[in-house]
Amino acid sequence: MRRGALALLSLIAAAATAQETASGSDAEALAKQLANPVASLISVPFQNNWDFGYGRDDDGWRYTLNVQPVIPFSIGKNWNLISRTILPILYQDDVLPGTDESGLGDTVQSLFLSPKEPWPFGLVWGVGPVALLPTGTREVLSAEKWGAGPTLVALKQAGPWTAGVLANHIWSFAGDGDRDDVSTTFLQPFLNYTTKKATGFVLNTESTYDWQG
């Protein structure tokens, strides 16, 4: 089963930096850092997703608020380790016919090893492991499986534009034996435009392919 989602509103973020930021070019530079998933910057983005055509009969819909704290750790002169957590807060209706549910979903924890300086042609990248943690508060909101796999992100920033893609694949290795195994590929291309007044406009799409479906 392939599921598509459109993030209609993305990245209203609170950021903490070691330096004070001023208006103008400094604020614009900070906004561009926020557009980079592996920037050396502590941030807490909030992402709102609406999914339609969901569930057994394709009549359901789901709203998800993803809380996505990003915390960088310096590893020597040349590398950063970026912790990126996605904690979903969910409400869904008619995913199971005639029902509605709300609560926390499963947490996805990623770690990206990323060079501190861009590579040739301005390429920024990060690679590492991703883990699925069964933190869902209700059975219908959780896979009830532990999972792991690889993840990567690659992007380029040119002028006011940031374009890139984030991807991962997760296989389950433990959890409720009565639930289906997890084998999913996630793909998220994204495009960001930052104005001179440090306002960011973000468009991204999310696709998940369930190899067990």
Set out the residue ranges of the language-model regions.
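Transmembrane beta-barrel domains of Gram-negative outer membranes and organellar outer membranes
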Residues: 19-213
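Cleavable N-terminal export/targeting peptides
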Residues: 1-26
